């Protein structure tokens, strides 16, 4: 599935509810999901992937509310090369 397809899927399923909730509260839900992901990762729990999926879905919901096309933004930021060194694979020194 392409990024745009996933964004459209989330829009179809959740946009009405997201609009009623508003962007501020939806963003807070995103932060809550990031917290759940952090806890699961730190504890070595087996549902880290599920928490990542939740974070992605809530991030997409926020993008939909803000009118942001994530596929366009991702390709602008990461044009098939590292945005810092312009190489693929990245040749930046480790940070």
What is each model feature region?
Residues 1-52, 56-95:
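Flexible "arm" and connector segments at domain edges
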């Amino acid at each position: 599935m392409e990024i745009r397809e996933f964004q459209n899927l989330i829009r179809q399923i959740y946009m009405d509810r997201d609009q009623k909730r508003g962007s501020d509260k939806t963003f807070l839900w995103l932060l809550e999901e990031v917290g759940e992901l952090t806890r699961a990762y730190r504890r070595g729990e087996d549902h880290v992937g599920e928490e990542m999926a939740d974070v992605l879905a809530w991030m997409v919901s926020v993008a939909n509310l803000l009118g942001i096309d994530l596929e366009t933004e991702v390709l602008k930021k990461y044009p098939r090369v590292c945005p810092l060194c312009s190489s693929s694979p990245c040749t930046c020194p480790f940070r």
